[in-house]
Amino acid sequence: MLDIKRIRNNLDEIKAAMARRGEKDFDLDAVVALDEKRRELLQQVELMKNEQNTVSKEVPKLKKEGKDATEVMARMKELSGKIKELDGQVKEVEDQLEYTLLRIPNVPHPDVPQGETDDDNIEVRKWSEPTHFDFEPKAHWDIATDLGIIDFEAASKITGARFALYKGVGARLERALINFMLDLHIEEHGYTEVLPPFMVNRSSMTGTGQLPKFEEDAFKLPQKDYFLVPTAEVPVTNMHRDEIIEGANLPLSYVAYTPCFRSEAGSAGRDTRGLIRQHQFNKVELVKFVKPEDSYAELEKLTNNAEKVLQLLEIPYRIVRICTGDLGFTAAFKYDIEVWMPSYNRYVEISSCSNFEDFQARRANIRYRPEEKGKVEFLHTLNGSGLAVGRTVAAILENCQDDEGNVKIPEALIPYMRGIKVITK
């Protein structure tokens, strides 16, 4: 959520930032007008309360002097009624203001490239060269089906489209990747492991920005008003909702494995086969709470931590800087890590690493106290996939296949596969 003072004092700047995003869904002038109305009402309430205090002191004084206090008491009653009425108006205006502020996206960082779609994202760097074969590479869903390690038909029968049923070596591969990623981030990168609930409440979804704007994208349990987690970012960030963290303890770095659940409401017809776009998938998530002055340096570290997974698996990838039109609602700046997929003959996103600055912290009321014991401030939050597990399985199947349909296990993963080096029929 944006600071209303920032909008009020830098209205033209915020309008320009929203224009960069291509946002036209709200009227910032109306937001400022609501804020002005709120402040006017609060001023009226304050004046009346001051008068009420003054008048209340006259009553005992008049009674002590034996004078009639009826008129003064009537004024007190009148003021009390007006204050109550104004308090109701203040609450109504504040609710309207919060409703609007919760729907305004984050301001893009000046270094975010201008653009409308993912075609306008800018490549920052590449690691290794794209994998090429002297045979026609198979798509990962065909490899998995032929090897008998993922059964898409059974998953569709059990549930529906966009689900996968892993079995045998396929299930072991998925589990091996989860453990490999967790161990790397905990033991090598210094993250603290968290195993959070897989369901969250409405306040948690609002705190990280999924609600209220994107409720249709979430899986909801209406009987409890709970939501299945779309990403571990939601429960892990909300661990510190309504808390003040000592500055000396920052940064806080967490890693969490969870299944993730997404309706993919806007993805009809896209990636309908395979593991790229599922309603349920596993993911290892990295979340950081940092001081504002450190947040962009910490974003570089987080991105490096995420890409290290692919380096150790020896899978080609690239890093792209996301443009304004592809940035998403909550991020001020974002990198995508895109893995090379031979059957697609292109790079496919496997991780997004974002700096939200104080956007989520304001929504979730997460603050820190500087070491010099100054005024508490909102901290910055970061997160990134480290990595999406199903997409990593897909990348291994496609990049490590041979002309006979077998798949070689990356060297770093063999200890987690109990010595299995090749998946064969």
Curated annotation (Swiss-Prot):
Leader sequence residues: none
Annotated metabolic or biological route of this protein: Aminoacyl-tRNA biosynthesis; selenocysteinyl-tRNA(Sec) biosynthesis; L-seryl-tRNA(Sec) from L-serine and tRNA(Sec): step 1/1
Enzyme Commission code(s) on record: 6.1.1.11
Keywords: Aminoacyl-tRNA synthetase, ATP-binding, Cytoplasm, Ligase, Nucleotide-binding, Protein biosynthesis
GO cellular component: cytoplasm
Reactions catalysed according to its record: tRNA(Ser) + L-serine + ATP = L-seryl-tRNA(Ser) + AMP + diphosphate + H(+); tRNA(Sec) + L-serine + ATP = L-seryl-tRNA(Sec) + AMP + diphosphate + H(+)
Residues the entry annotates as binding L-serine: T231, A232, E233, E285, S385
Protein origin, superkingdom: Bacteria
Pfam families in alphabetical order: Seryl_tRNA_N, tRNA-synt_2b
Protein residues bound to ATP: R262, S263, E264, E349, I350, S351, S352
Family, per entry: Belongs to the class-II aminoacyl-tRNA synthetase family. Type-1 seryl-tRNA synthetase subfamily.
Function of the molecule: Catalyzes the attachment of serine to tRNA(Ser). Is also able to aminoacylate tRNA(Sec) with serine, to form the misacylated tRNA L-seryl-tRNA(Sec), which will be further converted into selenocysteinyl-tRNA(Sec).
Name of the featured protein: Serine--tRNA ligase
Organism: Alkaliphilus oremlandii (strain OhILAs) (Clostridium oremlandii (strain OhILAs))
